[in-house]
Structure formats: structure tokens, C-alpha cells
Design a protein with these regions (language model features):
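Carbohydrate-interacting/catalytic domains
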Residues: 9-13, 17, 22-32, 36-200
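Alpha-amylase-like alpha-glycosidases and glucanotransferases acting on alpha-linked glucans and related
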Residues: 1-8
């Protein structure tokens, strides 16, 4: 519902960014409803086809009001488009480690543990971009717990380093880097991921 509480609004914005990030970095075709990128909720009505009123109309003023989310969505879509590893032409094989799963300690996750953290690494050497070069490796982690977690990062492949592409815990437009402007992490072995956040 409608609120003027800044803490609730901040949490909602972060959760929306988390959902859009997960959608855009998943395999397959991402499906968004017009206006998701600027918080058009239809007041919770997910079956508004017969509503010829404010519920189903698109209020374009929301795009200006929620410019930060529009910019985030634009950049995460660009990240997806720039990297074949996020939209592969074939499904993962079991013969090569195209995708590896991790818990926060950097080990294989215990799938029976009700942890609120999960991470995966996509091997870019298994995908070529449109320019004929192998893609980058990507590590994506989600912490849905109410506590911050210190992640043990997997070792990057030989000659590579980890760069920060997105962190939904960071406020404003700095939560996602412009393509080509990602910052190299000063700490290559660990990363503190705040509660309820995702990092790429």
C-alpha cells in the first residue's frame, strides 16, 4: 500500500532491484510488464485486462518519479545484452563447469540447509560474445537474510580479477556500473554483502 515511511520505501526499492536483477540475469527470455521499470503496480491487480481506468492505464509520470529504478533497469538490460553468458543459445551441459554453485563460505552449497544465501559463477570461457571473444566470468550472489554476510569469493581464473558490476545495497545510481566502468575489487577474496541484497 501507499506509505510515506522512507525506510519502507528504501526497502521496497531494493527488493524491486533484486527482482529485476534476478530476472535479467536468468537464462531464457525475460518477461516484464510495461511499467515494471518504474513501479507501475496496478494496485496489486494482476488481472486488469477489463479495467479501463487508472488501474490499467500507464501513468508516465511514474517514470520521472522513479528515474533511479528506470536507470537501473536500463543498465541491467545492457549488461545482459553485452554478455552472452546471460543468454546462452544452449542449456548448460554436465560435462564442463559452465555454472558452479556456492554457499557463502565458497564451498558447494548444502541443498538441504535452509540458508538464505546462494551464489553461482558463470564461466565466460564457455560462451563467445558477438565480437568472437570469450565472455567474462560472472559471480552472482544473493543474501535474503536479515543479517549481513561476508562472502568468500571463488578464485578468479588465471589472469582475471573480480570487478563490481552491481550491488543492490548501494543507494542511488551507483548500485550498478555503466558498461565498461566496473571497478576492480580491492579485496579479491572476500566481499561483505548486506542483508536483503544481491551482487554481481
Amino acid at each position: 500500500g501507499i506509505t510515506v515511511n522512507p525506510k519502507i520505501e528504501k526497502l521496497r526499492l531494493k527488493k524491486i532491484k533484486n527482482y529485476i536483477l534476478c530476472l535479467m540475469l536468468s537464462q531464457g527470455v525475460p518477461m516484464m510488464l510495461a511499467g515494471d521499470e518504474f513501479r507501475r503496480t496496478q494496485n496489486g491487480n494482476n488481472n486488469a485486462y477489463c479495467q479501463d481506468n487508472e488501474i490499467s492505464w500507464i501513468n508516465w509520470n511514474l517514470a520521472e518519479k522513479n528515474e533511479e529504478l528506470v536507470a537501473f533497469t536500463r543498465r541491467i538490460i545492457q549488461l545482459r545484452k553485452n554478455h552472452q553468458v546471460f543468454h546462452r543459445e544452449t542449456f548448460f551441459s554436465t560435462k564442463t563447469p559452465e555454472i558452479e554453485w556456492f554457499d557463502f563460505t565458497g564451498k558447494n552449497p548444502d541443498w538441504s540447509n535452509p540458508s538464505r544465501f546462494l551464489a553461482f559463477m558463470l564461466d565466460g570461457s564457455m560462451c563467445m560474445n558477438g565480437d568472437g571473444k570469450y565472455d567474462n566470468d560472472f559471480y552472482v550472489a544473493g543474501n535474503t537474510d536479515i543479517y549481513d554476510v561476508t562472502i568468500t569469493l571463488p578464485s578468479p581464473h588465471k589472469g582475471k580479477k573480480w570487478y563490481l558490476a552491481a550491488d543492490t545495497s548501494i543507494e542511488g545510481n551507483d548500485c550498478i556500473a555503466e558498461p565498461g566502468k566496473e571497478e576492480c575489487l580491492s579485496e579479491q577474496k572476500r566481499y561483505i554483502l548486506p542483508a536483503g541484497s544481491f551482487v554481481v
